[in-house]
Structure formats: structure tokens, C-alpha cells
Curated annotation (Swiss-Prot):
GO molecular function terms attached to this record: structural constituent of ribosome
Record keyword Ribonucleoprotein present: yes
Family according to the record: Belongs to the bacterial ribosomal protein bL31 family. Type B subfamily.
Top-level taxonomy: Bacteria, Bacillati, Bacillota, Bacilli, Lactobacillales
Annotated protein name in UniProt: Large ribosomal subunit protein bL31B
Length: 86
């Protein structure tokens, strides 16, 4: 196996810029910023979305695609909504 072909894997702190949530994880991501976390200094990587702010994990998910494939098919062929008839 060749040496020095893989990036360095080390602990990195990720900061969710939306919520301010910080978590420590192993990564090869590099950063010039550092942060003090749990008494140690780690590289800091800023992220816009994490499990703390993503709608799927927070339960605040919105369905933006109201006109799906089935709705378009029904509209195209003039079919009534089966649920509305009940």
C-alpha cells in the first residue's frame, strides 16, 4: 500500500449556522478556523444544514410539491379525485 495518498482523518467540530448547534465528528475536511470544544481545540467547519435544523429530522417538514404526478394525470384526463367523492 502506498503511503501519503490519503487525506488526514481527524476530529472536526461542525457548526450549524442556522441554529448554532455544534457537534464533534471525524472528517477529512480542512479549515483554517479553530474552536475550543469540550476543553480541546479543533478545526471548525460551518454548515448551513445539519440534523438539528433539517426539516426531516426536526418534524417541521413542509410538502411543497402539491401538484404531483397522480394529480397531473387526473387533471389531464379529467378524472375526479376519488377521496373527494367519499
Amino acid at each position: 500500500m502506498r503511503k501519503d495518498i490519503h487525506p488526514d482523518y481527524r476530529p472536526v467540530v461542525f457548526l450549524d449556522t442556522t441554529t448554532g448547534y455544534k457537534f464533534l465528528s471525524g472528517s477529512t475536511k480542512t479549515s483554517k478556523e479553530t474552536i475550543e470544544f469540550e476543553g480541546e481545540t479543533y478545526p471548525l467547519v460551518r454548515v448551513e444544514i445539519s440534523s438539528d435544523s433539517h426539516p426531516f429530522y426536526t418534524g417541521r417538514q413542509k410538502f411543497t410539491q402539491a401538484d404531483g404526478r397522480v394529480d397531473r394525470f387526473n387533471k389531464k384526463y379529467g378524472l375526479k379525485d376519488a377521496n373527494a367523492a367519499k
